[in-house]
Amino acid sequence: MSQNNDSLTRFMLDGANVRGALVKLTRTWQTISSRIEYPSAVADYLGQSVAASALFISSIKIDGRLSIQMRGTGAIKTLFAECTTDGTLRGLSIFEPPIPAHIPLSDFGADSIMAITIERNTAPELEPQRYQGLVGFQAQDLASAFEQYFEQSEQLPTRIVLFSNAEQAVGLLIQQMPEQDRPADDWSRIQMLFDTVRAEELFSLDANELLYRLFHEESVRVLDSLALSFACSCSRERVETALISLGLDEMQQTLLENENITVHCDFCGQAYQFSQEQGLSLFWPKSSVPVSPSMH
């Protein structure tokens, strides 16, 4: 039986005016998590974040990408997950050992910041259009924090469940759509059904089978399914922009100490190498690059 691995399934509960999304990641998650040897607690947060980014892209009506980014002062310094409307994902975490077996959300640090950013694709010569909202750390876990975000920022009652292990990252989301004259107990009834889902079901069941098992009495209707895969948006042009931002003085100093500069992408491992001439040509036209005698 196909288990809809590496897919995002959107659905409607027509009987209650509730929309939802189900994400299952296997190969994609294994590719992301294999780049760095993550402690289990860090991998768990990263897997949940990657799954959440796919869930959230399900309701985006623009051509672009959605990212979840956290900067903390605790053991986990950075958490980043991104999904595009084309179905490509990437993710990364930076942490500081030793890492405990369990990290409560409250231990991310008092000055921690987590943001959800939506970026609309634009022409290369135009500045990207971004929309950003902040996620609080007052919840018990990541899924609850995202639920509070949608409740407060989007005014959409939302339920989310997220799980990850070494093999898979999965998630389920339901949202009550705005509509007047709906029975007040519709949403309560759907939540009761939602609360029965177990991690083992999300890991093992086919998407259609899981949705039928949970919501067959609520006229569940699958809208579509999007294939998901790992892909990185790094490029030589982006690396050049980052090097230029360092400034000419730092570039010259680096090139005095090294024959060339090699930049590795932490997401995919791609290496970008720049010779002395290539590094300096980022600041001057190639024909006028001044070469120091010490750089011969």
Task: For the regions a language model picked out, list residue spans one by one.
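Interaction interfaces in information-processing and related assembly proteins
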Residues: 2-224, 292-296
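Cys/His-clustered metal-coordination modules, chiefly Zn-binding fingers
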Residues: 195-296
